[in-house]
Amino acid sequence: MGRRRAPAGGSLGRALMRHQTQRSRSHRHTDSWLHTSELNDGYDWGRLNLQSVTEESSLDDFLATAELAGTEFVAEKLNIKFVPAEARTGLLSFEESQRIKKLHEENKQFLCIPRRPNWNKNTTPEELKQAEKDNFLEWRRQLVRLEEEQKLILTSFERNLDFWRQLWRVIERSDIVVQIVDARNPLLFRCEDLECYVKEIDASKENVILINKADLLTAEQRSAWATYFEKEDVKVIFWSALAGAIHLNGDSEEEANKDDRQSNTAEFEHSSFDEAEISHSETEHLPARDSPSLSENLTTDEDDSEYEDCPEEEEDDWQTCSEEDGPEEEDCGQDWKESSAADSEAQSRKTPQKRQLHNFSHLVSKQELLELFKELHTGRKVKDGQLTIGTGWGYPNVGKSSTINTIMGNKKVSVSATPGHTKHFQTLYVEPGLCLCDCPGLVMPSFVSTKAEMTCSGILPIDQMRDHVPPVSLVCQNIPRHVLEATYGINIIKPREDEDPHRPPTSEELLTAYGYMRGFMTAHGQPDQPRSARYILKDYVNGKLLYCHPPPGRDPVTFQHQHQRLPENKTNGDEIKMRPGRNKKVKQIENIVDKTFFHQENVRALTKGVQAVMGYKPGSGVVTAATVSSENGAGKPWKKHGNRNKKEKSCRL
């Protein structure tokens, strides 16, 4: 049976309702000749929008003000400028960068750190805390006014007052204050006001800038920075925590191998004795050989339990280990004083005094670094017989914790790229008479031009990046094209004929080539540019893509000695030399239409008549047997199938 239809009466009501609705709509907008009481010849008070408006957005406020002023807006369709996506780099032009640098120099004096207010024995703890809060609040307001009025960009800085309180206490009890900076951009991570604050507290305290990751610089680059800081009357030391750790690991492996060889020799010599004699000989021999290592392990365990897992203390109860020593420990401290004095006298005889007056550009080792610290401070010490070195100030990824672990010879501080990872300062004794006072890593305020510079410097986390175009564009501007191609083994698309042939590649060109090479593709089959950007930026921060900022007054292009080592391709047709055994990658053609039109190499035409058969062309003369044999040998006999004399069909062309 077919589908039963609805009764006819059911659709009549809907038809009448639809007709009535259409009539009402048509009469609403048309005039009628019928008489009505609504003349519409006055102000319609019944249809006013009497809704109260107490708050409105900026756009609504602007439109309402324009309506009250009687301003009419007309769309302008002339002078339209389309901004392509590749032009949105987020970088500054040369004129803008020079203007911002001038503003940085003019407002350098406002870039300061909070000071601890003056206090005396009559000041109560509540009054001191309130004064510290007031000074800290005024300092933050000053930085906010600097950003708003001058339109300057500041780096992220520490906004927790408790961290600054620990900074004040560490400076007060330190003899040498060490700032750890990155060798690729020392001026960005240096805080000049911290050096002034140290001298304000005590003129006998010394300031030192420890330039970490100096192994990334060449000897000429280190010499240039040493000369610059020498003119600024600042002591700098070139240091590499990673190289020092590798050297220490190599020494430990050699010592372990030496101990294994000695143990094997001892076992071979005593193999002829019985078990009782062997056990007796081992008990006599092992303590004399392994006692230093056992003592080091015991001290290591004690130090780890004492410093790494120490609970958080109150601010009024912060004391170092030397302040809580008993009478027995005071005798030990007296021995430390005598040994440290003897060491300093011996070192003063060995090392020439001119080393304290000049900055040397060579890369120091761990032992040389400790000797320089001992020679640097010659005034009155905070604690007699003990040299206290305050460390820990610096941005993330500059190597604060790695430096301390390398100096101590084992892991004393956990390493992290997060600011504020160390919650409280701790004292670590390197040797008798030399103490490291590790302060939580404080991030000082500094000037930057763009947010992209902060991302490329490692200040902002790369994984939390919102827009990848400006940082990658900055990488393309700093790293030449041939260095990028040689580092990743890619071919970046060349500029068009109407563009500058020496322009840097855009972020899209670099990320597209890198994404194709690594296989980072989206669901739509396009290169995953944000994912590729994270890999490239991490390589830039880690130093795989190396760019070193020069001292003021030096040319940034000629300062990059590491870029001049790689040969630059002089012509566009040159290809990167590949390793033997690998297939050459296909070059990308920037304009496939022009290449196809002007370079038609395989042009064929359909002709009729006598054609070349078996290598013979009409009018070419007598065909020799050698020519026929060569033609036959060049082909594949198993592909002929007896179709040699048949003409090719036109549909196959």
Swiss-Prot record:
Compositional bias segments (type: Basic and acidic residues) = 258-288
Q: In the UniProt record, does the keyword Lyase occur?
A: no
UniProt entry tagged with the keyword Oxidoreductase: no
Major localisation: cytoplasm
The listed locations are: Cytoplasm; Endoplasmic reticulum; Nucleus, Cajal body
Which amino acid positions bind GTP, per UniProt?
Answer: 212-215, 394-401, 438-441
Which residue ranges have biased composition labelled Acidic residues? 299-333
What is the name of the protein in this document?
Large subunit GTPase 1 homolog
